[in-house]
Amino acid sequence: MQGPVYGLSTAEADLHPDLLPNFHYDDIFGTVVNRFLVQSVAGIPLTVYGGGGQTRGYLNLKDTLQCVALANRNAANKGELKIYNQLTETFSVSELAEKIKAVARAMGYPVEIKSIENPRREREEHYYNPSHSGLIELGLDPHFMTELSLIHI
């Protein structure tokens, strides 16, 4: 399982602007992180669906590349199955909104959070506690969602 990926910078992408990844912020291809970042600089309240309790695992783009390389270097033997959960942190939608609001306000954007009716058919509160130690044990050096990492996006 891979959690939603955020971030734009990788060692390779930083070499040339043509290597930058896509930045989707829409409801279909985008992540809530990107949507909140765009809303914050556009002066639109961060729209939290329902109570904002929807929790997911998140992964920095740099870590996605590390995970693929680590899994490749530690491939399963014939007849063996290895499954790695690709995530480094979990956040609820409300936690992400508060995190991005704080960063945007520190940068001078007057950001607010607005709860709207959830347009999705999903449980807003659920048990979610995924194990993600496998890749850490293989040597994953996580890049966590810090204030600085959000500013760089």
Locate each region found by the language model.
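Histidine (H) residue identity feature
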Residues: 2, 16, 22-27, 126, ...
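A conserved pocket-lining segment of Rossmann-fold NAD(P)-dependent short-chain dehydrogenase/reductase
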Residues: 3-59, 80, 85-87
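C-terminal substrate-binding subdomain of Rossmann-fold SDR/epimerase-dehydratase oxidoreductases
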Residues: 40-151
